[in-house]
Amino acid sequence: MASLLKSLTLFKRTRDQPPLASGSGGAIRGIKHVIIVLIPGDSSIVTRSRLLDRLVRLVGDPKINGPKLTGILISILSLFVESPGQLIQRIIDDPDVSIKLVEVIPSINSACGLTFASRGASLDSEADEFFKIVDEGSKAQGQLGWLENKDIVDIEVDNAEQFNILLASILAQIWILLAKAVTAPDTAADSEMRRWIKYTQQRRVVGEFRMNKIWLDIVRNRIAEDLSLRRFMVALILDIKRSPGNKPRIAEMICDIDNYIVEAGLASFILTIKFGIETMYPALGLHEFSGELTTIESLMMLYQQMGETAPYMVILENSVQNKFSAGSYPLLWSYAMGVGVELENSMGGLNFGRSYFDPAYFRLGQEMVRRSAGKVSSALAAELGITKEEAQLVSEIASKTTEDRTIRATGPKQSQITFLHSERSEVANQQPPTINKRSENQGGDKYPIHFSDERLPGYTPDVNSSEWSESRYDTQIIQDDGNDDDRKSMEAIAKMRMLTKMLSQPGTSEDNSPVYSDKELLN
């Protein structure tokens, strides 16, 4: 039997691994299309600033074709380095495109103020043809046209510091678009604006250089359409991360934005590990999870084998991304989402409307968090050197804190858990709701929220862990023979809570405190 389990583990790991690169054949290359990328031909700030001005205008032209737009965006993205040409040649390895670098220098004879560098030949007319939209469009009207601030005529500067701030403002907006351009382009506007405000408050960008919605939509759509552009952006991020020593300020900003880009599209996998496995609740011992836990283990190993490109597999359209979807481990994912909803309010906005979502295991995760609140793991306590008395103190404090948090919580909470088994479901359907709320301004009794203290099948409490605090959970006494008995039980528990509060007030001596029993309160 041990050999069977070992073979099963090896089988699942082998099945989830991608094929190894081998064989006598070379790399498969597709039919390439040429992309023209403009780079400054000198180190002058005027040249870079003028080139940036012309490129920003070209991006907003709706008639521009896709490959030309991709080349323009690559030119803008590489303007912050000292040698853009060397950077592009070093990191570009795309089987779908062929990059053609063209140097640009100032010219007094061309209408656009720039020309293509050549050995003796004049290419002013070709440069004017390339930048013809500039002269026929917004430049003739005396405005840049693609900024929200319509008072800005152009973005040409002759100072290196001003150019860096201007370029950082434009690059930040492009990089922010990458975070959700592939996964959620239709709902990305709000998060993109929040991040822009963040960098504005940090003085990394200037708010006056905010591009308008039309310009941003064009860039976002191109990022979503063109895999070659995304490959370049990911390669640029990785190249910046690898570079030693202090990095330029724009490079540090790109790394900061990368925190929003990394692992885009892998939320199901990452959250399942975070809430389903790292929390280490006893529910992981269920037989239903054994197969999916092995799947998660093999996926984590595959993630590590993919190396530095693993967090960008969705952005790079890697075919292995489907293995990481929640459909490969639906029960464990549903359970993890239930845990996450209870632990973090931010999880309440997640969309769980998927065909493989299992409500029963979602409620299992919720119930595990509620029933485990205030407990201290014996294994972790032993590792940290926490004594039994300290664990008891932590349990009491955590129970009271969790109770206050539960009352103030605004996330999706279920008022009554009918859970996994039909016996409980039938009883719950026959009984009235056990949660009653009264306003303080209204007459009558106030009934608190009650939680049952039943244990799930297969759940073994940790005997070395601290027990729940009585101030958090009270034993709910429900009788099946009528509503009057239920009301009496709730009134008795409410009175018991009031007496407990009175006894815990300052100045009350423990020696003179009367002892009350549940039977006396129920009579």
Swiss-Prot record:
InterPro entries: Paramyx_ncap
Amino acid composition bias (Basic and acidic residues), ranges on this chain: 447-456
Consequence recorded when altering S517N: In strain: Isolate Onderstepoort 1, Isolate Onderstepoort 2 and Isolate Onderstepoort 3
Species: Canine distemper virus (strain Onderstepoort) (CDV)
Stretches for region Ncore: 1-403
Region (Homomultimerization) residue spans: 1-36, 373-391
Name of the protein in question: Nucleoprotein
UniProt-recorded Gene Ontology molecular function terms: RNA binding; structural molecule activity
Gene assigned in the entry: N
Organism taxonomic ancestry: Viruses, Riboviria, Orthornavirae, Negarnaviricota, Haploviricotina
